[in-house]
Structure formats: C-alpha cells, structure tokens
Design a protein with these regions (language model features):
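Bacterial N-terminal signal peptides
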Residues: 12-26
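Bacterial N-terminal signal peptides that target proteins for export
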Residues: 2-16
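Short, solvent-exposed loop/turn elements at domain surfaces
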Residues: 60-61, 80-81, 160-163
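Exposed beta-sheet edge and beta->alpha loop/turn motif
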Residues: 110-165
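Boundary at the C-terminal end of the N-terminal hydrophobic targeting segment
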Residues: 27-30, 35-38
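Short solvent-exposed beta->alpha transition segments
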Residues: 63-114
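Short, aromatic-enriched amphipathic alpha-helices that serve as compact interaction elements
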Residues: 43-59, 69, 73
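Soluble non-cytosolic domains of exported or imported proteins
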Residues: 38-46, 61-65, 82-83
C-alpha cells in the first residue's frame, strides 16, 4: 500500500482510524461522567463538579442516568427527605429544570467551616439564561460514607434587583 501523498496515512487505514475515533466518541458521549460515586478523596468542589457534569448530560446513556449519579452524592439525611431515586428524579426535574442539560457552570470560591461546605455555582441553562445556586455539603462522620463529602441541599439564589440611581 502506498500513501496517496507523502506523509499521509494509507487510504484503508484512514477508514479504520475514522471508525475507531467514532466508536470512542460514542462511548464518551454515552457515559460522559463515568461511574462516579462518593469517595473520601473527593473534595466538596469535585463532588459538585461531578454532579453538574451528570446534570449536563442527564439522560445519557439512559433516561435519568445523570440524576442517579446526583442522587448517589446526596447525603443520607438528604436521601431520607427526598425519598428513593424515582421520587428524587421527579423532584429535580420539577424543581430544578434549569440545571438539566445546562450549557455551562462556573464554580465560585468554596466556603468551608469544619465539616460543612458551601459551593456557589453560576450556571447558564440550555436557553442561555443565567442561574445561581448554592450547594451545601457535609463530610459524613460515620457509616458507609465516612469521610465523604455529600450534598445536603441545593438552593437557587434569586437575582438581586437592580437599584435605580
């Protein structure tokens, strides 16, 4: 086999490389977050970033796959209030639609006080609108998730009204 031009990959190999690249892209698109779960090595900011990535691709590879990841990082106290995954998913879809399939998210500086952390986030939704949220996390003191940062609550911060001068 001769390359069609100096330095180019022979034609049969170009097709093979293209197919391999497309297959790799399909795997990444199908599961952009991977298997994310609480771990003591994850910082509060890393936990929020993982949850935001899951929300940005909420229905990949299957419906609510991203919400299952977010629920996996919900603290035991949060889970007791929000119920099983199905109820949690409905609550997020109804109460936080701007977070689903959002375009971008930028983290503010983290505020920590011992085993409690507040992580501000500015998010641009799929329609291009800006939203601000605060994630409250706590470091779990015992049990299955000992020393893991997990989300206790998320609330939207209303825009400040403009002051006329």
């Amino acid at each position: 086999m001769r390359p069609s031009a100096p330095g180019l990959i022979p034609r049969p190999f170009r097709l093979l490389l293209l197919l391999l690249a497309l297959a790799a892209g399909s795997v990444l698109a199908a599961d952009p977050v991977g298997r994310a779960e609480p771990h003591p090595a994850l910082s509060p900011a890393a936990v929020v970033q993982l949850q935001l990535a899951a929300l940005a691709f909420v229905d990949r590879p299957t419906r609510d796959a991203g919400l299952a990841i977010v629920w996996g990082f919900a603290s035991p106290g949060n889970r007791s209030l929000t119920g099983p995954l199905k109820r949690f998913a409905a609550m997020i879809r109804d109460g936080y639609p701007a977070m689903l399939n959002h375009r971008t998210a930028v983290l503010a500086p983290l505020v920590m006080d011992g085993a409690v952390a507040l992580q501000g986030v500015e998010l641009i939704d799929r329609e291009g609108r800006r939203h601000r949220y605060v994630f409250q996390l706590s470091k779990q003191p015992d049990g299955e998730f000992r020393d893991c940062w997990m989300t206790d609550s998320v609330f939207e911060v209303p825009d400040e009204p403009e002051v006329a001068t």
